[in-house]
Amino acid sequence: MSRGYGLIFSLKVVFTFLSLPHPPGLQGSLDRLQLEYVDIVFANRSDPNSPMEEIVRAMTYVINQGLALYWGTSRWSAAEIMEAYSMARQFNLIPPVCEQAENHFFQREKVEMQLPELYHKIGVGSVTWSPLACGLITSKYDGRVPDTCKATVKGYQWLKEKVQSEEGKKQQARVMDLLPTARQLGCTVGQLAIAWCLRSEGVSSVLLGVSSAEQLMEHLGSLQVLSQLTPQTVVEIDALLGNKSHSKK
């Protein structure tokens, strides 16, 4: 596969103690993609028995072998990221460059309160995912679960339960409250949500999931909305959401 201009390829690996020091499935994934290397490989640290030093050594090995240019973390705490950075400095290894974190209207604290400190201290940026909260922030649910939505797909029972929960209904009400703001900006609530995620300090990109080219183009329209998100507009959105993160200091 040829590398198109402006495209960034990434992979995610899951570590277990037995898989160290070689991340599992990485070469197989590269073969399936017909690539010699990816731009960035993310380490999903799901096994607390994997020593941090060995994870950092494994990712350094991946980069030194030419399989990736950089490495990042996924679903790591700020403390774990700082520990990895300290290990890299102590043993002359390669530190992570970014964290992959969930971020949307109803999941804010980590990206707004924890990761900016890492960005300023050690330069670790953020790649965020689920800007639409698995479709909850699209106004398509509106208190019900349509037959065509993801919540009806096998394996997504948890999403259906979330949509139908009291908390889910409250969140859907907040989404409906945002409709006038979206209309004022000439966009959909989904575009507003993606632009809102991009506004956060240290966020380099937002991961999108789409099922059609039309949906992709609609989501990309959020880039036009970003320039319209004035400080006053953000304050108004915060007031409607009622869940702005606050420093504990």
From Swiss-Prot:
Forms heteromultimeric complex with alpha subunits. Interacts with KCNA5 and KCNB2. It comes from Mus musculus (Mouse). NADP(+) binds at residues 44, 74-75, 100, 129-134, 140, 150, 209, 211, 215, 218. It holds the Pfam family Aldo_ket_red. This is Voltage-gated potassium channel subunit beta-3. Keywords: Cytoplasm, Ion channel, Ion transport, NADP, Oxidoreductase, Potassium, Potassium transport, Transport, Voltage-gated channel. GO terms for cellular component: cytoplasm; monoatomic ion channel complex. NCBIfam families: Kv_beta (TIGR01293). Strong expression in brain, with highest levels in neocortical and allocortical regions, hippocampus, olfactory bulb and cerebellum. Also strong in kidney. Weak expression in lung, skeletal muscle and heart. Regulatory subunit of the voltage-gated potassium (Kv) channels composed of pore-forming and potassium-conducting alpha subunits and of regulatory beta subunit. The beta-3/KCNAB3 subunit may mediate closure of potassium channels. Enhances the expression of Kv2.2/KCNB2 alpha subunit-containing Kv channels but not Kv2.1/KCNB1. May display nicotinamide adenine dinucleotide phosphate (NADPH)-dependent aldoketoreductase activity. The binding of oxidized and reduced NADP(H) cofactors may be required for the regulation of potassium channel activity.
